[in-house]
């Protein structure tokens, strides 16, 4: 997958040179480029923003450097142009899975009070991280790109690494434990030490269902319980 990020602060994306994403870049599974929007301004002082027509607080990113940077990147990257903004569709795991199927993507990070409306003509999709205010689009872009990239084939060692994670299947993840088996008087559940893979699988599913219902009832309501789920919960409750 190739991703180009249009931003005023390309140095912020150096985080992708590390850990799982960094290794995927080294293996050429991923290619993440940053493009400095400021390099495309025709203003002699390298300005990319100006005062809003009609008055108001703050500054607005000008259309010209945004549009020119998009046009240039589009010569090599034919992917969708995604703007990180408050009016967009709220990002979630389903959208991450959808975008992970793409071979190329372009992300546009806004700043200041927003972007000139005329730049929207070159944008295919707008995504919001949530109902809160951030300093700039970069803050939203980093977790969104990370979430998408880790679903690309080959980035993680196996699909099981993400299929069991919170939100992937609509539920929160089950509790995890590691050594020692007992810490400060608290022991790891016996089923996890049993080596019985089917029982472990059922325990994890039951815990995932119970935790989701308790912590995120909104997610639980959307989740469609199967007959197997109901049986797992019933058997689990009998053992309590």
UniProtKB/Swiss-Prot annotation:
Matching entries from CDD domains are given as: TrmD-like
Reactions mediated catalytically: guanosine(37) in tRNA + S-adenosyl-L-methionine = N(1)-methylguanosine(37) in tRNA + S-adenosyl-L-homocysteine + H(+)
Oxidoreductase as a keyword of this entry, yes or no, is no
EC number assigned by the record: 2.1.1.228
Give me the Gene Ontology terms describing cellular component: cytosol
Q: Name one GO molecular function term.
A: tRNA (guanine(37)-N1)-methyltransferase activity
Q: Which family does it belong to?
A: Belongs to the RNA methyltransferase TrmD family.
- Give the multimer and partner information: Homodimer.
* Described purpose of this protein according to its UniProt entry: Specifically methylates guanosine-37 in various tRNAs.
Instruction: Write the protein's name.
Output: tRNA (guanine-N(1)-)-methyltransferase
């Amino acid at each position: 997958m190739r991703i180009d990020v249009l931003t005023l602060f390309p140095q912020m994306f150096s985080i992708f040179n590390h850990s799982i994403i960094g290794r995927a870049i080294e293996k050429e599974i991923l290619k993440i480029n940053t493009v400095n929007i400021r390099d495309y301004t025709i203003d002699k002082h390298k300005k990319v923003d100006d005062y809003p027509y009609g008055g108001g607080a703050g500054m607005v990113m000008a259309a010209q450097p945004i549009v020119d940077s998009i046009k240039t990147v589009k010569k090599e990257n034919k992917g969708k142009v995604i703007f990180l903004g408050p009016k967009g569709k709220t990002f979630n795991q389903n959208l991450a899975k959808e975008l992970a199927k793409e071979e190329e993507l372009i992300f546009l990070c806004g700043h200041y009070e927003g972007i000139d409306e005329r730049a929207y003509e070159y944008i295919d999709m707008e995504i919001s991280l949530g109902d809160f205010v951030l300093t700039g689009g970069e803050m939203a872009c980093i977790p969104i790109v990370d979430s998408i990239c880790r679903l690309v084939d080959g980035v993680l060692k196996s699909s099981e690494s993400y299929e069991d994670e919170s939100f992937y299947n609509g539920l929160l993840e089950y509790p995890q434990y590691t050594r020692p088996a007992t810490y400060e008087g608290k022991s790891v559940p016996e089923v996890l030490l049993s080596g019985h893979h089917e029982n472990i699988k059922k325990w994890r599913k039951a815990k995932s269902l119970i935790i989701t219902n308790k912590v995120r009832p909104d997610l639980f309501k959307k989740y469609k319980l199967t007959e197997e789920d109901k049986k797992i919960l019933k058997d689990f409750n009998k053992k309590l």
